[in-house]
Amino acid sequence: PSGVSYMIENREIMMRMFPELFQSLKIEPVENYPEILLNTLKSLTPKNCSKKRNIVILTPGPLNSAYYEHSFLADMMGVELVQGSDLYVDQGITYMKTTRGREKVDIIYRRIDDNFIDPITFDRNSCIGVPGVFDSYKSGNVNICSAPGSGIADDKAIYTVSYTHLRAHETCL
């Protein structure tokens, strides 16, 4: 979610400034968030993946207000931060351009809006997406985490409905 890098940085500063507060209270750690996110992404590897599990974070680029967050997470997770122009689809397979040649991409952690991810499937005027990536996703050759259409789950307007729905679901379990 947006803002997690600031939370991690803030916590680190707070721990340095007020160590006694963290020693006396049972405050849950947050510094392991990037590792948890990475493991979650790895668990969502498509069946047709390479042995290496190549994960990338797809960002709109440095002019985006959340770019610091994207680069922070990529650095902390040890994955590549890419823009749409760094990726391409060939015969249904998503690849990343590198100085060593192309590398197959297995998982894309999407940080761009739905309409911009694939100019063939969505907004044809998008200059920041990857042409053909949605078909690659539908074919099971790449997994797009934070899949197109899933943004509604993070819409604050439905949080109260979500809470009620989750509580009802827990009761059924």
For each predicted feature, which ranges?
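ATP-dependent carboxylate activation and anion-phosphoryl transfer catalytic cores
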Residues: P1-G129, D135-K138, N143
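Short, charged/polar low-complexity linear motifs in solvent-exposed/disordered segments
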Residues: E9, S162-Y163
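Catalytic-loop motifs flanking and including active-site residues across diverse enzymes
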Residues: E69, D154, I158
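Ser/Thr/Gly-rich flexible loops in soluble cytosolic domains mediating phosphotransfer, phosphorylation
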Residues: G132-D154, S162
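Short, intrinsically disordered, charge-balanced linker/junction segments flanking boundaries
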Residues: I158-Y159, L166
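Single conserved hydrophobic/aromatic residue that forms the stacking wall/gate
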Residues: H165-L173
